[in-house]
C-alpha cells in the first residue's frame, strides 16, 4: 500500500518511533505491487460484525464497478505506465450479481485500453522501465 499505481522496491529495517519522523531503511530487491483496500472485494461486499467492529459491506455492485473503473481511468489519464491490482476472493466475488459486475468491469477495462498481465510480467516490465526503482507521476 505504498503507492496507488506503481510497483516499488520494498525496504527493510525501517524504524518507526512514537512522535518521531520515520527512518526508512535500505531498499531491497523485492518488488511490491500496488494494492489498496479500496480495490479489494471483501471490505465493500462482506458484512462483518464483531464486538467492537462493524464492517457494513453489502455495497451496490454497480457503484463499486464505477469506483474500480474510475481508479483505472485516473491512472490511464495521469500516468505514463502503471498497475492496478484488484483483489478478489472466490467466496465474495462469486455471487451472481457480483460476477455480472466483474464481467462488466473486465469489458470496460478492455474497451478503455487496459492490458491484463500476470504479476510476474508486471514486475519484469517495472524493473526494465525503472531500473533504479524510481517511478514518477507521468503526464
Language-model segments: residues:
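C-terminal domain-boundary segment and adjacent tail
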Residues: 55-139
